[in-house]
Amino acid sequence: MKKVIFSGIQPSGQLTLGNYIGALKQFGQFQDEYECFYCIVDEHAITVPQDRLKLREQTRSLAALYLAVGLDPEKSTLFIQSEVAAHAQAAWILQCNVYIGELERMTQFKDKSAGKAGVSAGLLTYPPLMAADILLYQTDLVPVGEDQKQHIELTRDLAERFNKKHADIFTMPEVFIPKQGARVMSLQDPTKKMSKSDANLKNAIFLLDPPATIRKKIKSAVTDSSGIIEYNKEEKPGVSNLLTIYSVITGETIASIEEKYVGKGYGDFKTDLAELVVSELEPIQERYYAYLKSEELDTILDAGAEKAARVANKTLKKMENGVGLGRKRRK
């Protein structure tokens, strides 16, 4: 039996090269080896204010991007979170098994609520919903960035607590972080992560950026004054970030890239890297726009929601029986 992978991405903001390298690029590779569930987590998105029309547009756009990067709907299950009711139902059960102190200690809650007067309860209870997303599918592996590890640890705690207290039904998920490229940094401030929500658009390369924009952003990426192309995260964070991008896209080791550019300057390196990124993203963009115009996209999402619901409802029923909700049903 194949191990199960679950991954969810919010439909808020444009996806970046960091999202692609950290997660999306691996999705096509996973589906031959694992049973994969890829979820567009629109219920997570509404923990902060959203424009309803824009949210729906971004949800459909993200689905098209998932397919454009290589997801095969015959091998993977692609669906929208809100179209599978079990997610919200399971989240409530888990919310009743988590402590407020655990939620308040979450770094993401602290960061997003800092200095704000009106913070939604949904932002605080985000982790139980994320745990439900993962646990409903008896997930073995969760591909996440370093910044999400704390949430996975809480998910494991909740699974263990529920298994001991109510019913032993959950698989214990493990974090899966690619060795290289899991954390792509900002182009202008390489001490912080590249983010799709960054106000400075120069900090990120977006997957739908035109080639000219990609070249301009990489050309203006922060480096240093030494002119030597070598990986040193502490002393040369900008160049190290660009080397990481180069390595993940080409599959070459960083050492071999360093050797290739001995005696060459940042200009040559950035020019070559820009062309590599453009070559990587152009075919994705072509497939994206084709899916966006096609009725096939909705057919795929309908089928994905149906399959996801069948799997999730089995786990939800066990959860309900475990805590004594409703009548004990055979079907």
Curated annotation (Swiss-Prot):
Q: Where is the signal peptide?
A: none
One cellular component term (GO) for this entry is: cytosol
**What residues bind L-tryptophan, as annotated?**
133
Q: Which reaction is catalysed here? A: tRNA(Trp) + L-tryptophan + ATP = L-tryptophyl-tRNA(Trp) + AMP + diphosphate + H(+)
Major location category of this protein: cytoplasm
What keywords tag this UniProt record? Aminoacyl-tRNA synthetase, ATP-binding, Cytoplasm, Ligase, Nucleotide-binding, Protein biosynthesis
- According to the UniProt entry, where does the motif 'HIGH' region sit in this chain? 11-19
List localization entries.
Cytoplasm
As annotated in the record, motif 'KMSKS' region runs over: 193-197
SUPFAM superfamilies membership = Nucleotidylyl transferase (SSF52374)
Q: How does it assemble?
A: Homodimer.
Q: Which NCBIfam families match?
A: trpS
User: What protein family does this chain belong to?
Assistant: Belongs to the class-I aminoacyl-tRNA synthetase family.
Task: Report the protein name in the record.
Answer: Tryptophan--tRNA ligase
Annotated source species: Listeria monocytogenes serovar 1/2a (strain ATCC BAA-679 / EGD-e)
Q: Which gene encodes it?
A: trpS
